[in-house]
């Protein structure tokens, strides 16, 4: 996250020793970095080699010590797009990602959508009415909420909720916390 304190970023970079950092501050101690707003001078049409990273993701966790920890997914960086099928994520899906990509679920579902040839509409910060507006404006089909987000949307005045057409949604997925039965019933 761009909001991490510099000390935490330094600790994460020290633990991971990344080959490349995309974005970030110019003074970060990274062997190679691509600065924000980078535009290459030229792009080749030549096919690229297909290197596979050793790990497909490395998520951070504060843990109980106060020092950042890295949770490595030891699977290789290849994805079978068929894994998205049980999530009802069809090829070409239009997904709303209301959560930060440094959390596991938003990271995974956004990647599955992109790997399936879909598009991702992200939110810089969750806002209940803005989520409804984006679903309406972009005819989004799939979203992963946490119960708190669903509660905030349901807590909007009925006239605000009804202002937006969300009939394009095919899947509303939730995880990360228990869902109160009454809230799930309202959403169904």
What are these regions (language model features)?
Residues 1, 99-103:
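Conserved AMP-binding
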Residues 52, 56-57, 69-91, 151-155:
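Conserved structural elements of the adenylate-forming
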Residues 1-51:
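Structural core segment of the AMP-binding/adenylate-forming
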Residues 115-116, 124-188:
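Conserved adenylate-forming
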Residues 80-94, 102-142, 156:
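Conserved AMP-binding/adenylation subdomain of ANL enzymes
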Residues 9, 27-33, 70, 106-108, ...:
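Short glycine-/acidic-enriched loop or helix-start segments at secondary-structure transitions
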Residues 3-4, 24-26, 53, 126-127, ...:
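Short beta->alpha linker loops
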Residues 58-65, 178:
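Conserved helicase ATPase motor motifs in RecA-like P-loop NTPase domains
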């Amino acid at each position: 996250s761009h909001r991490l304190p510099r000390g935490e970023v330094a600790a994460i970079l020290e633990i991971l020793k990344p080959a490349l950092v995309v974005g970030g501050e110019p003074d970060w101690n990274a062997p190679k970095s691509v600065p924000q707003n980078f535009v290459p001078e030229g792009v080749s049409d030549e096919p690229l080699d297909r290197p596979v990273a050793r790990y497909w993701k490395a998520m951070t966790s504060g843990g109980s010590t106060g020092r950042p920890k890295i949770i490595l997914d030891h699977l290789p960086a290849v994805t079978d797009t068929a894994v998205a099928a049980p999530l009802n994520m069809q090829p070409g899906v239009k997904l709303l990602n209301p959560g930060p990509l440094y959390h596991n679920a938003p990271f995974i579902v956004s990647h599955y959508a992109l790997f399936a040839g879909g598009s991702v509409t992200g939110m810089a910060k969750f806002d209940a009415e803005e989520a409804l507006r984006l679903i309406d404006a972009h005819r989004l089909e799939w979203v992963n909420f946490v119960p708190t987000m669903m509660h905030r949307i349901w807590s909007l005045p009925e006239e605000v909720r009804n202002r937006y057409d969300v009939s394009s949604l095919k899947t509303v997925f939730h995880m990360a916390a228990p869902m109160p039965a009454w809230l799930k019933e309202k959403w169904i």
